[in-house]
């Protein structure tokens, strides 16, 4: 039985901690907020999750909302200008439904479960001194927080990080009075080329079902207008204006005017997509092992963040449960590389969506308009971006793939 400390009680940290407790290990968890404080705070994510990641939660018995929350069973992508002229549209069914649970509901419940299983939950702002104490009293220290002094422990890996600054200005909103699109509930990706994106899907929040959407503005463009926004109502008003101005087809879903689900249902920010080295050395020489966003963070444009957290937690959990030796740097790096074998596809998948699409990518997306099987493959790529390798990521493989589909038609 190992003693393991986890700093950060989010999707990855709690998932891993609960799994380790179920596997017979002793676990200390550090959170800077209580469950009650999380529940009473601002939204933290859009947390769109799909079949594989939800399945990992189900394995641990922590999928408490599987039957009571809205689900979406399709994905669609539309590229259109500000006048609503459509240049691209496809929709495909998902093999397994997606779901989004407000983390203000989810994390407090998981914290309760962690303690029910015998975990030691510490409420504190973790600093370097605390990390040193935890490293000295535990067999393994895992950092699941990518913010502040602790987040800076892990050095950027330039070979795996093509960007040095944010590629989008982000504005997240939970709303009512935004009708679902006709047909199957879907995650809807809308692109206004050169301006930005609008992503929406159903979710469950504090007062029940809602719609969750993110506006992704290209920095310096006409939707990059958030610096003077101060209040939640200002945020909502700007969101509705941008929706009407730049995504008129989606604006047709508004019933009168949008309403916030609550006065803390907004979030703004900028993320620089970054992959870091997973092992950090503390001043004492002790090691810290980073997980999920602490060492591999993507822009939310493809809805991969919470999925990555669950998948990284699954890889780490399996590796820890199978290990009977010291948790040294060699083991840490090998464990992360197991995760990276999957995560590298997520990084490419997301980064390709942030930049002007290469010709082969446009050929695939255009082909999906008239090829229902290809549209389904693209819809299910949200669940597993690796499943569309190599043909989505490599122009030569894309040509071969499309030629084979044409010959088979």
Residues of each region from the PLM?
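Beta1/beta-strand and adjacent pyrophosphate-binding region of the FAD-binding site
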Residues: 1-12
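Conserved mid-domain beta->alpha element of the FAD-binding
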Residues: 6, 17, 269-347
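Glycine-rich FAD pyrophosphate-binding loop
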Residues: 7-9, 18-42
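N-terminal FAD cofactor-binding segment of flavoenzymes
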Residues: 33-81
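Short beta-strand to alpha-helix junction loop
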Residues: 48, 93-109, 144, 150-151, ...
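Central beta-strand plus flanking loop segment that forms part of the substrate or channel wall
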Residues: 154-189
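Conserved FAD/dinucleotide-binding core of flavoprotein oxidoreductases
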Residues: 192-266
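C-terminal helical "tail/cap" subdomain of flavin- and related membrane-associated enzymes
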Residues: 302-303, 318-409
